[in-house]
Amino acid sequence: MPKSLALLAARVLSMPNFLRALVAFYCLSSAIATAQVGIDVSRISAEPSFEDFSEMSPSTALARSMTKVDDFTQRLPDDGDAASQRTEVYIGYDQEQLHVIFLAFDDNPNQIRANLSSRENIDGDDIVEMVIDTFNDQRAAFAFRSTPLGMQWDARWTEGSSMRAGFDTTLETVWESDGQVTDQGYMVKMAIPLRSLRFLDRPEQLWRIQFGRIIPRLSEESYWPPYLIDIEGRLNQTAPLTGIRNVSPGNNSQIVPF
């Protein structure tokens, strides 16, 4: 160990316990912030389909042109550990929509929980999730969830500790989802119309994003980037999203059929 690091370690160990805890918390927070790598989303030429991901792998030029995210980290039950099941996310956009494909691998696909249900009634099923802060202000975000059969749930997330913080499921917007269970796990496709979102009218967007997966039989939640219990707040743990250019925001006022 370098002498400077040895001296620093000795000083930390000589501190009272509460000061050591503060130093550890600061170092963890700094490490998370430093490791928070952003993604540059690809503009794609067509809407992706499950056929582009045959055998749960990007099998066409379109699929391979999308931006890939993986290496999810647990929040529950073991905060900070690697996810027990592999998840890959592929994201791209065109002039009208944001496109996302989830590949949720599972060692025991016959234990995946997936039920046909009404919109929003998906508690207890396996779930994949996308959270998007379209103003990059870490105050509020759109959230979209789907089950392995494509059953939808959407909400608005508000940051903070007030009574209004957390998910507001009164948000109802129009978007598309589909799902398919396979012998390796399941796939989910999301297509979010840009007119369903609110964002700044400027040539290039700077958003923040987070992907999640919930496996109820394992009581497991995992996320990319990590969404850790030891760090206060959620949207400050999202990743910067760049690359979306020359698109127009909508007014976010649509009628959702029942």
Report the location of each language-model feature.
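Serine/proline-rich low-complexity intrinsically disordered segments, especially terminal tails, linkers
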Residues: 6, 16, 31-32, 179
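Residue-level micro-sites within transmembrane alpha helices that shape
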Residues: 16-19, 125
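Structural preference for beta-rich elements and adjacent junctions enriched in aromatics
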Residues: 35-258
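Intrinsic disorder/low-complexity segments in short proteins, especially the signal peptide
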Residues: 10-13, 27, 33
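Bacterial N-terminal signal peptides
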Residues: 20-30
